[in-house]
Amino acid sequence: MAKRGKKYLKALELVDKDKLYSIEEAVETLKKMEEVLQRKFDETVELIFRLGVDPKYADQMVRGSVVLPHGLGKELKVLVITQGEKVKEAEEAGADYVGGEDMINKILNENWLDFDVVIATPDMMPKVAKLGRVLGPRGLMPNPKVGTVTQDVKKAVTEAKKGRVEFKVDKTGNLHVPIGKISFDNNKLVENALEVIETVQKLRPSGLKGQYIKNMVMKTTMSPSVKLDVLSILRSLEAKAA
């Protein structure tokens, strides 16, 4: 294990390893740790889920997207690959780049990747498939499951600009989802976190037996993790939905 610095170890002292934290307490603890760590950049706060699924089975693959109420704290560049009347719809919705085969060729021939989200209409997907090797490893390949292959271009662009986050469980059953920057107000981080947890909970595979969300932690890019009280958080979400 890599040797931890003095600031990290001091931040670690702020976490009670035997305690399960509420979301509000976790955010507050991360803020206190940030004062100790004194990083020179605005760290991303993320939720990490340990799910009781085996992703090698297709029916246990957890994948989706969520529109964070308060975004991610950065302006995303959106590329729409489409044709015909949908070009104007994409431009009016605020897409940064819009095109068809010209955009596909630009990516293939110039290794152009100056965008954060790629949206495509279904009619373009046979041609977009050529980009799989380039976009796939970067998590940028359009996919109907997360709303980036769609006829409703306006909605997709609007959601991407607002801060729609895509997520996918990894092969070990872990799921990482960013919820904002440490500079965000506490309430904004809490509300973003609740939206993510509620969305992930709704994606529980129908045939899954046993516990779905085994544990959750919250951390910043380089901070220690804070364990969350999964049962209490899920109960409060159920009560709110009732």
From Swiss-Prot:
Keywords, alphabetical: Repressor, Ribonucleoprotein, Ribosomal protein, RNA-binding, rRNA-binding, Translation regulation, tRNA-binding
One Pfam family in the UniProt entry: Ribosomal_L1
Matches recorded under InterPro entries: Ribosom_uL1_bac-type, Ribosomal_uL1, Ribosomal_uL1-like, Ribosomal_uL1/biogenesis, Ribosomal_uL1_3-a/b-sand, Ribosomal_uL1_CS
Gene Ontology annotations for the cellular component aspect, listed alphabetically: large ribosomal subunit
Domain of life: Bacteria
Function recorded in the entry: Binds directly to 23S rRNA. The L1 stalk is quite mobile in the ribosome, and is involved in E site tRNA release. Protein L1 is also a translational repressor protein, it controls the translation of the L11 operon by binding to its mRNA.
PANTHER family according to UniProt: 54S RIBOSOMAL PROTEIN L1, MITOCHONDRIAL, LARGE RIBOSOMAL SUBUNIT PROTEIN UL1M
Protein's UniProt name: Large ribosomal subunit protein uL1
